[in-house]
Amino acid sequence: LGLRTLTVIRDTLGFIEESGRPVPDLDRVPFTDDKVYQMIAAGDTDGVFQLESGGMRQFLSQLKPDCFEDLIAGISLYRPGPMEQIPRYVKGKHNPGSVVYSHPLLEPILCTTYGCMVYQEQVMEIVRALAGYSYGRSDLVRRAMSKKKHDVMAKERQYFIHGTEGVVGAVANGVPEAVADKIFDEMMDFASYAFNKSHAAAYAVLAYRTAYLKYYYPVEFLTALINSFLGSVDTVAKYVYSARNHGIKVLPPDVNFSRARFAPEGGAIRFGLAAVRNVGGAVMEVMVKERTQNGRFLHFFDFCDRVDGLNKRMLEALISAGCFDSMGGKRAQYLAVYERALDASVAVKKARGAGQMSLFDLEGGDMLQSEQIPLPNAPELSHQIMLVKERESTGLYLSGHPLDNYEEQLKKLKYTIDELAEADGTGAIKDEEQVTVGGLMTQCKQRPTRSGSGLMGYAVLEGITGSVEAVLFPRTLQQAGHLFVDDAPVLARGKLNIREDRANSLLIDEIKPLGEANRSLYIRFESLPDDVMTRACAFLKRYPGETPVVLYDAAKKIGKSAPKEFHVAITDAFLAAAEERFGKECIKLK
């Protein structure tokens, strides 16, 4: 479990060394830093080993750990079985006077855990202190309890209470029989789920060290953390969003500044080129080496000429991710010429092999710029299309998010989609709980029911971070109508199914447009004669939904509300089509 974390720690220390700052010796860092414990107690534990689940955060906010012993106990308690002891432990920590021991002999054993049995070692100590077991025999009891050997434990109960050869027994040691019987019951209930303390302590060391690095070196730590999850788009998105929430900028991918992997850059995190889809890490390593040896790329065509191993899919993905934005051209322009540019560079490289020719040798020494392959005077992609292409090429929205306009509404909801995805039934969210979340409908599919009596809806509901499977029964699917389409922003209410063997799913029983109740779409026209209005309404009718539309006549300074049958669903597809038809500057949601 700790291997990934050890890699993150190693890479974090490497980034710190690169920055020229002193590298902390974690073996010498004391486990007593109040600021680190305050961060943990606040639930700010993204990326902290063993402490980042929603339920654990909630527990930590109640516990408010302030010492290493609390971390060891917290990791041990937050498991099925021992979890029942959490309220008692928290109460004991914050009110030591409430701690009650079944017998005085238990106090020195359980005082550090406020009267609660938390570790297997405590069970071993109890049978030794109360009944006179040897070290070896106490370990046999621990093993029998953990493996639920009931026949063995029935005998051990009698030995614990009344003794046997080599065992004094609790009664002979001054413990009342009823008390001894009760203590043995508590050990039985607890021991089958218990951690051993040494195991929990090893986990707590990693938990503290990752928390320490997160607090004092957040840029380096989050960069290393993101790199450790490059194969998981949802997890990368989660930590990118976490960085932004901590005021850390995540800079876009750029062929002149990015490395193959994510890297710290001037107090920010630079997106790694290898995280762009269809772009091989090996090719990007070659690119970085070329840039390091021969300087930054002067322009798009210089990049095509100097980097070996490129293909058209790679170039398209790099353009869509914004990797050439700093060179001054528009993404739409690069998308229009990249195939010709790559063909030209391949031809020149072949010629170079025979005659030492380069792109700079063409046309009497002129560089291959717009004179040879001109960048078209094309308008930039609409913001919606740009976001879609960013998502297609990186798995993330880089220059914004389709849900940004709904941020205030989403903040008012009790849960987020990533919290539903991570729920394990032990935290705030329980299995089959009714929840309401906001997100984007994606991967929408319809399939017949087994009886053939209707259609089921299957989709993935995506939040700003995280995603959860969504299921709609025929009645709900029929009611959803136009909302069951890709990229539709929705407010979904339903029952969460928490499953151990596969991803959680949300059984949706009600779905509404997200934020549409308070917004209207305004479309501005220089003038609005009847024929223009008729064509506009015909366009709107192709995107039926709940958002009211106002057609504004600039010449008369009058707004006309479109009839309800021309209300629209605000999706990425609709906004892209509307911007193309009416002009980006002529449509507005408010």
Q: Which residues make up each language-model segment?
A:
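Noncatalytic, beta-rich nucleic-acid-contacting surfaces in large DNA/RNA-processing enzymes
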Residues: 1-590
